[in-house]
Amino acid sequence: GFSLFVSRRNPQLAQSLACASAIGVALRAAGLRPTPHHAMNADGIGRPWADEANGVYYYDNLVVLKYTRLPGVLLEAGVIINRDEERELATPARRALTAEAVAAGLQACGVTSGGGSARMQGN
């Protein structure tokens, strides 16, 4: 299953969470499911949910999320310790399905592409 992460230390938390949730909605609409294993309190994981229905967790101290001044989301597309999922993630069809869903989620939260770069609408 997939996981999405945002940091409460990111100054753009509301936008980060909105985009992460939109990506989660799109991934679920594509037939993919979030994994709950990051919320389990084993092996020091125990991450709190930000949006359980859409697979979004808080990961406050992850450097790439907390130090950016822009909205930030980290996607874990699957769990490779699950051998079946690892094999599926290696297929072009699964990668395309994931990429299309992420693109739809980004579009839903107002990220557009143009001129070779992505930007938030309204910024």
Residues of each region from the PLM?
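Active-site-proximal helix/loop segments of hydrolytic enzymes
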Residues: 1-123
